[in-house]
Amino acid sequence: MTLVGNFSPLVLVGDSDRVEAETVGAYLDGWAGHDKVRLATANAIKAILSGAGRLVGSIARGYLPGDPGKLVGVNSDQDQQKSIDVGSHNLFVELLIAAGVASILSEEADLPVAGKADGLVAVAIDPLDGSGNVGLGAPLGTIFSIFPADVEEPFLQPGNRQIAAGYVSYGNSVDLGFSVGEGVIFATLDPVSGQFHITRRNVKLPERTSDLAFNASVQRHLSAGMQAYVNDAFLGKDGPRGRNFNMRWLGAAVGDMHRIMQRGGLFFYVNDSRPGYEKGRLRLVYEANPIAFLAREAGGKATDGSRPILDIVPQTYHERSALVFGVAEELDILGEYFVK
């Protein structure tokens, strides 16, 4: 018996009007005009969205094609690589080379992959963020950063030289958040047309938040100042902060980013006393940088606890960094604790 057929979509009760929104491709074409670097940037983003559309099909099939979480190797930092990690890397590299980018830095490769010799942009990407959630139905994502390729080491530039950045969140819908330096735009993949349609423009973070996203299990390993910040938040309205806080942790930076961009909040994944966590855990070039770019465009902030992420000059391709991002007011408050 066929349980799912080619039926018409569910009609929302009380809100059955279909949104006829501009596609991201059309927006990028208008933004790029005849500018060569902008055209190269637009083509790179389109390639990533094409890859995201293909990747989500594999994610949605779960274990049917095989085990997406099968361990197949390790990356440069000895992090375990799953089958879908490597498959995602191969997919995006193939599409970005075809789009004419100069080089690609991926979490799943030790060194940048060479592309078109005269390419104008370089793309740093985490092909599948949150792969620890593979097979669990929990959030996954793709996150990327686009730099000008006009220097010898495009991936060792500070984040303030980014041309564009974005992420794709694979959840109960496939959502895109991106910016080309003109505000944050949200879009959603229409599975029928295969196109991403813009749903919100000029997205802004709220001025205040009571939502925190962090891994509470590592609290005992945090610095004294950070432990004090967490303890004061846990005390809620009876403590020095004078209000209650909610705690969120999705186990995928893209998932937490997407929630914070919509609802507000503050995320932190900072350095702690555990071996291997002395400088934080997230990668500066293709995780912290694009998040910081988007946070800034949405009126928020992103730091490593003391320095703006976008001002940090990477020393290595896969350099790790502490990361705090979100609502500016709360980040400033955390910063006072961080330096204690």
Curated annotation (Swiss-Prot):
InterPro entries: FBPase_C_dom, FBPase_class-1, FBPase_N, FBPtase, Fructose_bisphosphatase_AS
Cofactor: binding details: Binds 2 magnesium ions per subunit.
Molecular function per GO: fructose 1,6-bisphosphate 1-phosphatase activity; magnesium ion binding
Gene Ontology CC annotations of this record: cytosol
Binding residue positions for Mg(2+) 2: 126, 129, 287
PROSITE patterns membership: FBPASE
Listed name of the protein: Fructose-1,6-bisphosphatase class 1
Organism: Brucella canis (strain ATCC 23365 / NCTC 10854 / RM-666)
Lineage, top ranks: Bacteria, Pseudomonadati, Pseudomonadota, Alphaproteobacteria, Hyphomicrobiales
